[in-house]
């Protein structure tokens, strides 16, 4: 994350500015089956993955509605980009239950990105 994290408004502005680029790259992204590394890196540098991350690790702690507007705007360019950013954003949710030292260790490397899934672990 960054020392001065972009706000949700900053990310929304950048997402809007990048819609056409994302649309133009969508077919190549789909064919590759993954985000191009330069795109993943720039999304990280622009603060997208840290929208819900705690501020003590450089996250924006954005309200859910603001983050979802960012995701919606990215999806207007390329839904797969929006999906990847959404996974990165939601993967930061459990960080609030970790100690400050653990969070700092996870984000010791600039541009750290998380990915994961939530699934029910109980039985009915």
Where are the model-predicted features located?
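Alpha-helical interface subdomain recognition
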Residues: 2-69
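Glycine-rich flavin
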Residues: 37, 41-44, 51-124
